[in-house]
Structure formats: C-alpha cells, structure tokens
Amino acid sequence: MNYNNKILVSESGLSQKHLIHGDEELFQHELKTIFARNWLFLTHDSLIPAPGDYVTAKMGIDEVIVSRQNDGSIRAFLNVCRHRGKTLVSVEAGNAKGFVCSYHGWGFGSNGELQSVPFEKDLYGESLNKKCLGLKEVARVESFHGFIYGCFDQEAPPLMDYLGDAAWYLEPMFKHSGGLELVGPPGKVVIKANWKAPAENFVGDAYHVGWTHASSLRSGESIFSSLAGNAALPPEGAGLQMTSKYGSGMGVLWDGYSGVHSADLVPELMAFGGAKQERLNKEIGDVRARIYRSHLNCTVFPNNSMLTCSGVFKVWNPIDANTTEVWTYAIVEKDMPEDLKRRLADSVQRTFGPAGFWESDDNDNMETASQNGKKYQSRDSDLLSNLGFGEDVYGDAVYPGVVGKSAIGETSYRGFYRAYQAHVSSSNWAEFEHASSTWHTELTKTTDR
C-alpha cells in the first residue's frame, strides 16, 4: 500500500480509519516512519548512575543496550552481535566493562567497539577489521532532565525542540521540583492491543475516567472519586488539554497532586507538594507552580506516557499490529523521604502495574478496539476525535501549544494523529516538516465540524 496517498487520519485529526489499530502491513510501515524516525524513551539517569551500568530497552521491535560510559556520557547500541546476529545481553540490567557473546565468544566494550575475537590470528589472520565491526549505535541520545531518549534518525530535531510546547508543562515537575527518579525494574505485561490504543488513551482521555474506572474510583477513594459512574463532570475550569507540533500532548487536571493514590496517602502527599509552593511561585510563577501540583496525563509521541502526580510512567513497546508489551515504572521526586518513595512505587504497581486494578479497567477497552480494527466490516469505519473541535486556540497569552480550555475534550488526540498522519505519509523529516508547516492552523479551524 502506498501510504503517501493513503488518508488514515482526516484533516485536523477529526477521525481515524479503524484499520490503524489492526493492519499488519501498516504496522510494518510504522516501524520505518514512526519508530525509526522519532525519539523513543530508553531509561533514566537514576537507573544507570555509575560507569559500566547498563539496561536493555526497546526501540520499536528492536532491543538496545543503554550504557553509561567512563566519561559519564550515555550511549546506546543494538543488542545484536555483529558476527552471527545473536542477542548479546540477555538480562535487563547490570554493570560490565563489556559484553561477550555466548555463541562464539566475540567481546565488545561498553563503548560498542569489537575488542576480542577468539583465535583471531589463527582463524582470520589479518583479514578481520575490528574497527568496522562494532555494535550498531543509536544515532542520537539526549536527556530531558534525566530522562534519556534515543533516536535512530540523524535528521530528527533536538529532543527539547521535539518535545516543543509540551516541555513547558512538564518542566515544573521534571525540573523545578528538584528532579525526579525512576523506580525500576519496570513491571511488564503483554496485551493484545495496538500500541496506539494506550498511547492515545494517556495523551488526553479524561472522558472515559468516570465510566471505565467507576469501581476503581470508588474503592481507591482518591481525590477523583466523585467522578465514579459518571456521577458528575469535572467542573468548569477544572483543567485543560494541549498538543504540540510533533504530536506530544496532555490533559491537565488542576490541583490533583495526590493523583489516583488511595486516601491513606493523600494528606502526606498534599503536604509534601504544598511545602514547595512558595519557592516555586517565586521561581517559575504562579501558573507553572500550579501545574507542578496538578495531575498531567501525557504522551510523548509516539509511545511514552505518564500520569505525573499518580507517579505512573509507561512505555508501550510494539510487538505486532495487535500486540504490545507494556512497561510500567514509578516516578518519584528526588527529595521525597525514602519511605514515601517506596509506598508510592507500591501504589503505582497496585493501580497501573501488570495486575493493577486501574490497568485492568483499561485493557479490555484497548484490546477489543484494536482487534476490531482488523475485521472486514469495521476496519474502514471512522473513529471520532472531534470533541471540542472549533474551540481550541493557539497563541494563548499564558498557555503554549494548541490548547483546549476544558478538562474533557479531544484536543490532544487530534494533535497526536495529525503528527501520525504526517509521518506515515512522509519519507523523511524534511517532508514531515513541510506537511506540518501549518499544523496549528489546521488544528484550530472553526469549520469542517
């Protein structure tokens, strides 16, 4: 199929063909145009603090080794031996000066260089050029306040530019709070859903919370419990949504610092966050200080999502068009007491981990929506994301990005899928940029409802 001319997402991101969640040929195309081109989350500084520390991570369907170098920098390499293609490292994390393949014993340094070959002189003589046989390196590795992302494409914009307007909303928690830590290793589970189904859910779907999560809201007694069973809408002014040029976006629920954590944690969390308010008001202003203590449900395009004040951090690793491996970490503020960090991490796994009750609520929705995307009659139907269209603004005096000033809407859906369509119909970054030259105008139209 020629995706340069295939319209999978309508103008302004108002709808998507259902087949985007179930078509295997399209999935293979995504590996080239989405996962080989965009910035993908790898790890966090706190998980590889010392030289020689490494973790394995996924970039699309490929696995990489992410290693702290002797000079403190971080590099990433395909986890594939250059001799006969065997997986080089079979564990999730460790510390090593190098990596030795268990097939024929070829040894690579933590810098990716081929350092040793058994019986090299006897078997190869002078014919083996080890300098050309190092591990394939991920072209770009950059950090957003300790969160490490990698990109295979040299032409990609710098990570900070790629995050764009979304960074303004993330930095109060990621930077100005004093910094974050990632608690690993991640909980892992495989779901029978396309990777985009959970990514779109986290990018800004507050609409489903009261209904899908009714029992979880009631049993957890979180600050959002009043929404259970669609008993009420969030009041006017309770939040907003935003999206950005490269597809990253989020919803903001004001003053939701204790997130989905149960009632026993709420007083301690609210006191901890509240203690930083005076300093943050002075450093970054009242609005961004309020964003720090507000609940953000966010997706960094394409497949990294988070619920900031709930401490949930996700990577949706694709396996095929209808299968995704979900990695769930906890994020905690660096200066939290160690006991509070531990209890928050436990709460994350209890709510959104592999067996979490909030997670279980979502999975059936995501799985059946994805599986229906490959069925004959439903695959060409349109999935709607038009809620709030015509009310979004760009160039607001306070809030950057394309903004929908309501807690419930689909602003960030439209931005996510506008970027998605631009990528799958482009051959490179230059073509994507051309297709995105009027991105905010397209998303803020007031016609074509």
Swiss-Prot record:
The keyword Metal-binding applies. Fe cation binds at residues 208, 213, 362. It catalyses: naphthalene + NADH + O2 + H(+) = (1R,2S)-1,2-dihydronaphthalene-1,2-diol + NAD(+). Its cofactor is [2Fe-2S] cluster; Fe(2+). It is an enzyme of class 1 (oxidoreductase). Changing residue 50 to S: In strain: G7. Changing residue 202 to L: Unable to catalyze the cis-dihydroxylation of naphthalene, biphenyl and phenanthrene. PANTHER family: 3-PHENYLPROPIONATE_CINNAMIC ACID DIOXYGENASE SUBUNIT ALPHA, CHOLINE MONOOXYGENASE, CHLOROPLASTIC. Residues 39-137 form the Rieske domain. This is Naphthalene 1,2-dioxygenase system, large oxygenase component. Changing residue 362 to A: Unable to catalyze the cis-dihydroxylation of naphthalene, biphenyl and phenanthrene. Component of the naphthalene dioxygenase (NDO) multicomponent enzyme system which catalyzes the incorporation of both atoms of molecular oxygen into naphthalene to form cis-(1R,2S)-dihydroxy-1,2-dihydronaphthalene. The alpha subunit has a catalytic role in the holoenzyme. Also able to catalyze the cis-dihydroxylation of biphenyl and phenanthrene. Keywords: 2Fe-2S, Aromatic hydrocarbons catabolism, Dioxygenase, Iron, Iron-sulfur, Metal-binding, NAD, Oxidoreductase, Plasmid. SUPFAM superfamilies: Bet v1-like (SSF55961), ISP domain (SSF50022). Binds 1 [2Fe-2S] cluster. Binds 1 Fe(2+) ion per subunit. The naphthalene dioxygenase (NDO) multicomponent enzyme system is composed of an electron transfer component and a dioxygenase component (iron sulfur protein (ISP)). The electron transfer component is composed of a ferredoxin reductase (NdoR) and a ferredoxin (NdoA), and the dioxygenase component is formed of a heterohexamer (trimer of heterodimers) of three large alpha subunits (NdoB) and three small beta subunits (NdoC). The lineage of its organism: Bacteria, Pseudomonadati, Pseudomonadota, Gammaproteobacteria, Pseudomonadales. Changing residue 201 to A: Unable to catalyze the cis-dihydroxylation of biphenyl. Its EC number is 1.14.12.12. [2Fe-2S] cluster binds at residues 81, 83, 101, 104. Changing residue 391 to K: In strain: G7. The gene is ndoB. Belongs to the bacterial ring-hydroxylating dioxygenase alpha subunit family. The keyword Metal-binding applies. InterPro entries: RHO_NdoB-like_C, Rieske_2Fe-2S, Rieske_2Fe-2S_sf, Ring-hydroxy_dOase_2Fe2S_BS, Ring_hydroxy_dOase_asu_C_dom, Rng_hydr_dOase-A.
